[in-house]
């Protein structure tokens, strides 16, 4: 069993190894021991959240039948191996339904570990009323202001973000396991534990394979979203 909330800040666990035919692939599916929402809450769920010391079952649509889809292009070489990272963002993946159930949305992504890069930096000029600063990575040009709107039921805010990170104790952030490319960083503020506003954007951060892009964030100089 894995506690996914412990696998943060670049920590990972091996899920397993298996053989595949050489070629290009675009997704994997994980068959998970999770109940269907139509089955009702199980008495002893294998996949669950701990809320106020109590187990709350975590449902996944078709997770035990068609599988939980992880998306990302990768190449399996002939007579070779490829290491994949399945990156899971709790801020997007877990949502509460109107009936008080928790479901796992299909937001996991795959990155070939040998190709992955990262973005990190310090954050300065933080608003006094901010309880949290969250940095979201978007593929270049993908962010629209509607991403920050109040989400519909069973949806999450910032749904098209590639990944995200919360500012740490030393006022820094790091966005792990990014495919090579250009990204925009959307900086959001939480007040008293809830989303408050988007503070601005850092545009055109370039990520290369096996390297870290340094992108310090001065909130007073952010571009207007």
Name every feature range the model reports, one short phrase each.
Residues 1-225:
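A short, solvent-exposed, low-complexity linear motif enriched for acidic/polar residues
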């Amino acid at each position: 069993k894995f506690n996914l909330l412990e696998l943060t800040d670049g920590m990972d666990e091996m899920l397993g190894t298996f053989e595949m035919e050489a070629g290009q692939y675009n997704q994997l599916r994980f068959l998970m021991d999770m109940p269907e929402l139509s089955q009702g809450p199980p008495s002893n769920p294998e996949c669950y959240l701990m809320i106020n010391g109590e187990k709350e079952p975590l449902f996944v649509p078709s997770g035990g039948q068609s599988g939980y889809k992880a998306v990302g292009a990768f190449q399996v070489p002939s007579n070779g191996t490829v290491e994949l990272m399945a990156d899971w963002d709790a801020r997007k993946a877990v949502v509460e339904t109107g009936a008080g159930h928790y479901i796992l949305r299909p937001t996991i992504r795959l990155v070939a570990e040998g190709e992955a890069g990262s973005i990190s930096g310090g954050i300065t000029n933080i608003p006094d009323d901010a309880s949290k600063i969250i940095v979201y990575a978007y593929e270049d040009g993908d962010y629209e202001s509607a991403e920050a709107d109040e989400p519909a039921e069973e949806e999450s805010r910032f749904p098209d973000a590639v990944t995200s990170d919360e500012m740490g104790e030393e006022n820094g952030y790091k966005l792990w396991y990014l495919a090579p490319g250009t990204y925009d960083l959307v900086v959001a503020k939480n007040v008293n534990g809830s989303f408050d506003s988007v503070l601005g954007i850092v545009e055109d951060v370039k990520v290369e394979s096996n390297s870290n892009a340094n992108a310090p964030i001065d909130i007073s100089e952010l571009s207007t979203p």
